[in-house]
Amino acid sequence: MSDHAGSAFAVAVAQFAPGADRAANLAEIERLAALAAARGARLVVFPEYSSYFTPEPGWDWQEASEEIGGRFTEALGAIATRLGVHLVAGMIERLGGDERRVGNTVVAIAPHDGVVARYRKLHLYDAFGQRESEWVAPGDVAPPELFEAGGIRFGLQTCYDARFPEVTRRIVDAGADVVCMPAEWVRGPLKEAHWRVLTTARALENTMYVVAADHAPPVGAGNSMIVDPMGVEIATIGEATDVAVAWVSRERIEAVRRVNPALALRRFDVIERVNPSSR
């Protein structure tokens, strides 16, 4: 790894299949974070719903939900501090004032500092026969929260958001170099192809890195990956429970943008829809 000197920074995707045993999920997060750190990673991205997951949402999700600052984020903070790495993971967040629905939230955890950024999923998975919105409340449209690690600026988005290019465009416009994308990309006909195309497109059209961590099978599609600003997969995992590490750098982003200055040449900005359910 000595060839990657200067501002290069090692990041990892961690792929596993979270379940209904919250203690087991945390133990697997700790194991995979340690494995990634041993391979040189300084930031590790875990899947959506890493704190708790069942294939069919129900009242158990409300019971398993936690506030930010609760046991799950406290445990992540302890792991991050012990290993000296940043962690990004999805969790089920308890929302005040809503007795049924929870938040599908991603948190970024820094060593010694705890939560440094958070994101509530904007676009819920009401597609392909699923109705995530029955049990999950959408996040509010707000300025993207970024955090910095190793001189690299990171943003957050979640799973189904990948089908909405405006989400990633707002993140790159806020100044991010990398978008971390925890996911629970459900398997199905052509779904693996959709996952690869969309993840690659978000990296290529924004000339930024995408670090996309999915659930391992049998429910998730696997295929967690890190894609560079030219749309090249520089680290991938197939179906295994594992981690994959790659180097990211602002120099690579700048070099790609000199060749492909699409962001500078565009003629449109992203604005929020006034009536998002009008069509």
What are these regions (language model features)?
Residues 1-43:
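N-terminal glycine-/serine-/threonine-rich phosphate-binding loop
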Residues 97-174, 187-197, 201, 258-262, ...:
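Active-site catalytic loop in hydrolytic enzyme cores
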Residues 15-17, 47, 120, 214:
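Residue-level recognition of beta-strand->loop/alpha-helix junctions
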Residues 22, 30-112, 118, 186-205:
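Cys-nucleophile CN-hydrolase/nitrilase-fold catalytic domain and related Cys-dependent amidase chemistry
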Residues 89-91, 104-108, 145, 224-226, ...:
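Short beta-strand scaffold segments in enzyme catalytic cores
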Residues 68-88, 162-244:
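CN hydrolase (nitrilase-like) catalytic-core segments centered on the catalytic cysteine
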